[in-house]
Structure formats: C-alpha cells, structure tokens
Amino acid sequence: MNLEVLAQLTVLTLIVISGPLVIALLAVRKGNL
C-alpha cells in the first residue's frame, strides 16, 4: 500500500470515528447542564 493511500484511510477513519464521538460528548454535556 502507498503512504498516500494509508494516510487517506487513516484520516477517513479518524473523521468517521470522531463524528459520533463529538455528538456523544455534546449530548452528555447538555445532559449535565
């Protein structure tokens, strides 16, 4: 695998994982308030 392809895959996975995580964090913070 090329480094470019690997980098793109890692960035894609990070975005896919961080999306729901950010939403969950916001929901938890709103619930605490």
From Swiss-Prot:
It is a single-pass membrane protein. It comes from the Eukaryota. GO terms for biological process: photosynthesis. Its main location: plastid. InterPro entries: PSII_Ycf12_core-subunit (IPR010284). Keywords: Chloroplast, Membrane, Photosynthesis, Photosystem II, Plastid, Thylakoid, Transmembrane, Transmembrane helix. It is found in: Plastid, Chloroplast thylakoid membrane. Belongs to the Psb30/Ycf12 family. HAMAP family: PSII_Psb30_Ycf12. This is Photosystem II reaction center protein Psb30. It comes from Cycas taitungensis. The gene is psb30.
